[in-house]
């Protein structure tokens, strides 16, 4: 009987901790910009951005994920609010958020470019040449530190030296 009570308390404590963690994540998520657009045709948008990248002599950096993904929102927040990272991003890339969610899995875009998020988790990144060729993929995990991102690692990634 003592074992049953212990197990019940352990389960209750775990559920309470998970609920608090989920609530904290939802509060954090609400404080960030929502850069993903589930209604958008990702393949069509990437085609437009490739033309822009060619004209501007840039690469296309595709961040794959969704507004449901706290790590996706954290990365976007870092690179768009840190002046040094934002400068690199704006100078070298056309930056795009390719949505992956139940509402829109962007299957056509993923059939063309692959979906590294399915292998690595989200966010995942695609670096595209202006001609549409995939230069490389990057998993988010390599850039993370604690509950956020390591600014030095992200800088190296954006500079193409990671």
What residue ranges belong to the model's regions?
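A short beta-strand-turn-helix
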Residues: 40-60
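Short, flexible loop segments at the rims of nucleotide/cofactor-binding pockets, characterized by
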Residues: 37-40, 74, 103
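Thioredoxin-like thiol-disulfide oxidoreductase module
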Residues: 83-85, 90-154
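Short, solvent-exposed mixed-charge patches
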Residues: 160-162
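Conserved redox-active cysteine motifs that mediate thiol-disulfide chemistry
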Residues: 64-80
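N-proximal helix/coil linker or "cap" segments that precede and/or mark the start of modular domains
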Residues: 20-40
């Amino acid at each position: 009987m003592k074992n049953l009570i212990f197990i019940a308390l352990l389960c209750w404590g775990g559920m309470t901790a998970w609920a608090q963690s989920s609530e904290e994540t939802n509060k954090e998520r609400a404080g960030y910009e929502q850069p993903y657009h589930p209604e958008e045709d990702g393949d069509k948008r990437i085609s437009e951005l490739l033309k822009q990248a060619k004209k501007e002599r840039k690469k296309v950096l595709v961040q794959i994920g969704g507004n449901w993904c706290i790590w996706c929102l954290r990365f976007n927040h870092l690179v768009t609010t840190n002046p040094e990272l934002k400068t690199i991003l704006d100078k070298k890339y056309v930056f795009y958020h390719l949505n992956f969610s139940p509402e829109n899995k962007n299957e056509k875009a993923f059939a063309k470019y692959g979906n590294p998020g399915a292998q690595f988790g989200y966010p995942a990144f695609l670096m595209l040449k202006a001609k549409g060729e995939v230069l490389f993929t990057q998993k988010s995990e390599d850039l993370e530190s604690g509950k956020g991102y390591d600014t030095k690692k992200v800088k190296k990634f954006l500079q193409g030296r990671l």
